[in-house]
C-alpha cells in the first residue's frame, strides 16, 4: 500500500526507521506529505499534515475499498490514542534524557529518522528523531492519558536550559528558514519537480499519479518552481500572496510567480520568503519585484536558494 500511495518507496524501510514521503493525486499534483515509521514487519505508523489528516485517511480507505480490494491491509486513525509533542533545539537530547531517565538517546541508539519505543509511567511511549524545524529535534508520543504529565516533566527538565513552549507561528518561521514546504506551497497546483522534490520519486510507475504526472504541461521548463526570496532593502517586508514581476515589467496580470510563505528571520536580521517563480533555481542571483496590489506594496527582492540556513544540515 505505501509503495502505491507514496511517490517514493517504503518496501525496504528497516524496522525502527522512519521516512519522509510525498503523496500525489491521480493527476500527478502533490496531495500531502508526512513521515511513516516501520514498527514491525507489517505494522507502520503514518503521520500527515494537520490540514490533510482526514483527507488522507479517507483517500486510503477509498483506495483499499474500491481500487485495490485484494490488498490485505487495514488503516486506522490512532490520533486520539496519543498525546504528541515535539522538542527541538541544541539541548533537546539532554532535556529529553533528563525527563525520560533510563532511555539511550545516543546517535547509535536513536539515529536521525530513528524510532525508540519504551514506557512512560505505565503508558506506551514512542520517540522519533525527526526535525521539521531544522534543529536537533524529537517527536514524543505518549499514551493520551499521560500527555499532561509528559508535558510537565519536559518543561521541568528543560527549565535550566530556558526551554519554552513554541507554537505554529514559531514553527512556521523555522521551516521557512530551512526551505521546508507546507500548505502554502502544497496548494493543489504544484508537482514534485515544482517543489524541488523530484529526486524523491521512484523510477517505477506503480504509484498514484506516476503516469499523469509526466504530462507535458506538468514538465514544462517554464513552470513556476520553488525559490527563496530576500528583500534587497533588509528593512522592507515581503507579503505572502504578492505577485512576482521582473524589474521594469508592468505590474499587471499573473506575473512570473508568487510569494507563498514569509517570516522574519532573527538569525539573518531580515524578512525572508518562499515563492514559486518561473525558471526556479535558474533565476537565483536575479531580482524580482513582489507586488501586493491591495497593500500598495512593490518590494524589490533577490532570488536565492530556498534553504536560508545550514544547507548541509
Sequence positions of predicted segments:
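Conserved, structured C-terminal
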Residues: 39-313
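Extended, compositionally biased flexible segments
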Residues: 1-43, 47-66
Amino acid at each position: 500500500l505505501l509503495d502505491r500511495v507514496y511517490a517514493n518507496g517504503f518496501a525496504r524501510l528497516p524496522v525502527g526507521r522512519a521516512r519522509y514521503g510525498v503523496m500525489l493525486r491521480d493527476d500527478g499534483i502533490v496531495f500531502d506529505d508526512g513521515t511513516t515509521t516501520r514498527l514491525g514487519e507489517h505494522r507502520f505508523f503514518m503521520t500527515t499534515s494537520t490540514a490533510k489528516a482526514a483527507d488522507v485517511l479517507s483517500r486510503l480507505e477509498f483506495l483499499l475499498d474500491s481500487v485495490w480490494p485484494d490488498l490485505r491491509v487495514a488503516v486506522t486513525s490512532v490520533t486520539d490514542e496519543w498525546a504528541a509533542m515535539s522538542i527541538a533545539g541544541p539541548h533537546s537530547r539532554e532535556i529529553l534524557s533528563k525527563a525520560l531517565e533510563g532511555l539511550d538517546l545516543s546517535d547509535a541508539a536513536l539515529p536521525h529518522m530513528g524510532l525508540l519505543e519504551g514506557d512512560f509511567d505505565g503508558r506506551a511511549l514512542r520517540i522519533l528523531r525527526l526535525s521539521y524545524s531544522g534543529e536537533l529535534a524529537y517527536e514524543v508520543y505518549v499514551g493520551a492519558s499521560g500527555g499532561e504529565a509528559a508535558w510537565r516533566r519536559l518543561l521541568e527538565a528543560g527549565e535550566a536550559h530556558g526551554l519554552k513552549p513554541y507554537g505554529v507561528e514559531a514553527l512556521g518561521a523555522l521551516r521557512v528558514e530551512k526551505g521546508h514546504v507546507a500548505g502554502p506551497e502544497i496548494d493543489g497546483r504544484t508537482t514534485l519537480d515544482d517543489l524541488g522534490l523530484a529526486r524523491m520519486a521512484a523510477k517505477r510507475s506503480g504509484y498514484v499519479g506516476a503516469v499523469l504526472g509526466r504530462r507535458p504541461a506538468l514538465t514544462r521548463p517554464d513552470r513556476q518552481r520553488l525559490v527563496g526570496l530576500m528583500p534587497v532593502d533588509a528593512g522592507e517586508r515581503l507579503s505572502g500572496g504578492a505577485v512576482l514581476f521582473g524589474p521594469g515589467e508592468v505590474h499587471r496580470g499573473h506575473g512570473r510567480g508568487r510569494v507563498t510563505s514569509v517570516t522574519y528571520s532573527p538569525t539573518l536580521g531580515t524578512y525572508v520568503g518562499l515563492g514559486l517563480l518561473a525558471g526556479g533555481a535558474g533565476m537565483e542571483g536575479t531580482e524580482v519585484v513582489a507586488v501586493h496590489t491591495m497593500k500598495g506594496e512593490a518590494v524589490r527582492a533577490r532570488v536565492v536558494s530556498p534553504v536560508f540556513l545550514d544547507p548541509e544540515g
